[in-house]
Structures are given as structure tokens and as C-alpha cells.
Amino acid sequence: MGNILEEIAAQRRLDVAAAKQVVSTDDLAKKIEHTESVYGPALPVLERLNAPAEQVQAYANAGASMISVLTEPKWFKGSLDDMMEAREVVEGMSQRPAILRKDFIIDVYQLLEARAYGADCVLLIVTLLSKEQLIELIDATHNLGMCALVEVNSVQELDIALAAKARLIGVNNRDLRTFKVDMNTTARVADAIRERGLSLGRDGVALFALSGIRSHTDVVKYEKCGARGILVGEYLMKSGDIATTVKDLLQNVTRHSESGEFALLPPLAKVCGITTVEYALAALRNGANMIGIIMAEHSPRYVEKEEAKAIAKAVREYGERTGPILSDILESHLDDKSDWFHRNVLALREACSRAPLVVGVFVNKTATEMNAAAEEIGLDLVQLHGDEGFEICKDIKYPTIRALHLPDTAQCDGVDAEAVLQQVSEGLANYILLDTTVKGQQGGTGVAFDWKIAAIFTQARLPCLMAGGLTPENVVKALSVGHPVGVDVSSGVEVKGSPGVKDLDKVAAFLKAVKDHLSVATLKIDEETEN
């Protein structure tokens, strides 16, 4: 057990001893007489929070079957009053969500508290308890009319849970001793349950996947391995749109339009020309999906390898991952080479839904040089921003973005979009980026091309990313005209006249505009449908 867990458990023992001096077990028993429990073990989804009333209401409206409330006061700033407030919010609903007390429970007194303050279910963490303690707490939970969700993180902990006759088991994909996430933990535990001759489901062990769930693909993966529920917390809190995110997780609903099936999916956002860890984290906190690092020595935004490594490490840690994820996801999507760019974009969206990615931008380097740099730095994608062509992609070991350079709208009467399309070859670059070309510059030009070309690419089932002259003020229009998979910004979020120096207010405004675009577009379509 890690020191932090030992410290928390020790503190909770002190907390319980103090609470017993203030509120007796008899007082709690009287309070329990006035509360009812409705919990049953078949739940499709769980969600968790420290419970402001508006969040509880939002989760309930989104279809949560259970709302998990943190009640540990010192480290997680929770309280029993938070849980009672959550119960009061959902009370009276015809199919109200169950309330789960999420805490470090080590004493039967805490179960009495849970029942008295409105809980239907409690979390029991195996790594905190002996088998004898677990048996005692499970029995006491059931005697109080509640259900015990028993959390395990390994096959060894599973055996302890099964010996205690636990039948509702949550597999935490996060190891509480190291805080590392392993998304295969649930599958390993599910296999172990079957190997022990037990079934998964209503008549056997009800299995829940906890932690790290960020996409519909994750949900499908756990459903296939036998899980009957999921717990989603931080990902929902960061999403900004609980209802839409829950629907996406559970149903994978997409909307289509005449401009192509990607048009009304959330646009991805890449912030490029990042030169410091501070800038990267600011972009990530505001919702950036990709962080771009310039590896071209002639660029004013060039980053030395040591700083690039620090930025890449910070991005991985922010996304709670230790290595690349896109390559593995691409393998599952590219078993069939047909509809090449469509399949690649699906994989990119899935990867970005799990964690932000790091892109290294190169100009006229050899495949050997780019492979070596990508491995040393820890890149997820290699962006080709020079005159490399497409064939070089065969020799690059990482997913690639190929930039196509288009003229500035002010410098030409028009562009032959069909001729541009002819430059693209399937089966080579994974993604296409449309950017503006300016003599003497490759990227970061601050000028725009004709955004209608991006729309032509989308209609031709060549979904692309779009860069060139994008700013917080014009990105919504660019998205509305071009319908790209995502947008790429660099100079548009910088301090004027200072390449590589990000204006964090502009970064936040740009990313907010990208996020808000989808809500505006969806509202417009809904209004048109009603009319």
C-alpha cells in the first residue's frame, strides 16, 4: 500500500473516532429510519463528483444510474452534507439515480453514516482492508439495506473480494499506489472471474470498469469483456457538455450533413509552435487536442530537443499515459485499407478523446532523422511541412500529417481545387493539413487561404485539418465554411510581433470558439428542422 493511502486511512480512523464522540450510533440509527434505499445492482453507467446541486441535476438529467459523491474531507474536500444534498436533488424522481458514498471506508460506523445521509451504495476498497474486515463491512452494508461496490485493481485483490462473497465488483484501472492507469486491468479481472468458474452478469458477478474511460470505444471494449457498468468522472467534468458527452459515450451518435459526415462532429484543435511546458499546459487546460512542436531549425518557433522532450512528457502526463496510443488505435481501424482517410480520422478522434497528442513538425528532413527524433522526444505524430512529398511516409514509423501549401487568397484569383486533390495519395500520409504558403515561410504565416477548398476536400471524403491565418475572431467562420476535421493555430494566438510567445488569453479564446462552434451549428440545424 502506498504511503498516501496509509496516510489517508490513518486520518480516516482519527476522523471516525472523533465523529463517534459527536454523533452516536443510536442517533444515526434514528436518522436512518427516515431514509429509504432503492439501489439494485444492474446499472449501465455511474458518474462521480463533489456534489454541487446543479452538477447532480445535470448528471441525473443525462441519464446517470448512480451518482457517486466524494465524502472524504481532507484530501478531496467532500462531506456527508454533499451526499445528503445530492440525495435531496434526486429525491422524487420517478427513476432516481442511486447515491454512492465514495470514501475510504474502514469502519462500520461509516456505513451507518452513509445510510443516514442518503446513500444507497458504498465503495469498499480491497487494498485498504483485510479479508476479515471486508467480510464484516459487506455484511453490515447489506444488513443496512445498501449495496457494496467492492473495488479491486488486480487478480490478487479479486480473489480477496470473491472470498468475501462480493458480487458487485468495480475494477479500478488506476493503481492507487502509483496512480498509473492501465486500461487492460478490467479485461484481466474479467478473464480471471471466468477462469474461476463464475459467470459475469445478473446471476453471477456484476463487473464495473472504473477510471480512464474517455471514449465510446472504451465503453464498447468493457462491454465486450463483460462489464455491466462504467464510472466516469474527470472526463465528464472536463467535457463542458455533460449531456452530449454521456450520449457519445453510450450511443456513439453522429450527425451527418450535406457537407460530409464529419461536419457536425466536434472539431479537433491543435495549438502549434508551442515553445514551453507552460504554454502546452495552458492549451491543454483549455481543451487543445494536439500540441505542435516545431523541429525546423530555421523557424523562430524552433524548440531544442531537451525542451521538446519536456513538453512531450508534460503532455503525456496530463493525459495520464506513459507511451503512444494512436499507433495501436490505427491498427484496429486500418485492417481494411478502403476509405483510408475516413478510417484514419476515426482513429485520430478516438485517440484524442482519450488523451492529447504531441505532433513534431519537420521541414525537409530524412525519414531516418524524423524517426530518431520522434523516438527520442516521444512524439505521437510526424508532420511533414516541407517539400517531402508523400512517398517518404512509407519509411516513417509514426503516423504522419502531410501539409499541402495553398496560396494566400489576396495573392491569387483562385485555386484549382481538383488539381490540389490530385496531389493526394491514399495509403501514405495518415492525415492532410491545408495551410497557406508564403515565400520564405513554411507555417506560421498568419495569412489565410480560400477556406472553401477545405469544404471541397470534405465533400470528396478527404477530411482534412486546416491552418493558415486562423485567429479567435475568424475560426468560427473558418469552421462553418471549410468543415474541417480540425483546426491548427500558431501565430493567431501569439503576442503580436513575437513568434513563439503565446498570448494565453488568445489561446483560451481560440479554443473556446472552437468548442462553441459545435453548439451553435447544432442549434442552427435543430431550428431549421423545426421550421
UniProtKB/Swiss-Prot annotation:
GO terms of molecular function: indole-3-glycerol-phosphate synthase activity; phosphoribosylanthranilate isomerase activity
Signal peptide: none
Enzyme Commission code(s) on record: 4.1.1.48, 5.3.1.24
Residue ranges of the region described as N-(5'-phosphoribosyl)anthranilate isomerase: 255-531
Key words of the record: Amino-acid biosynthesis, Aromatic amino acid biosynthesis, Decarboxylase, Isomerase, Lyase, Multifunctional enzyme, Tryptophan biosynthesis
UniProt GO BP: L-tryptophan biosynthetic process
Pathway: Amino-acid biosynthesis; L-tryptophan biosynthesis; L-tryptophan from chorismate: step 3/5; Amino-acid biosynthesis; L-tryptophan biosynthesis; L-tryptophan from chorismate: step 4/5
Role, per record: Bifunctional enzyme that catalyzes two sequential steps of tryptophan biosynthetic pathway.
Family assignment from sequence similarity: In the N-terminal section; belongs to the TrpC family. In the C-terminal section; belongs to the TrpF family.
Protein name (record): Tryptophan biosynthesis protein TRP1
Organism expressing this protein natively: Phytophthora nicotianae
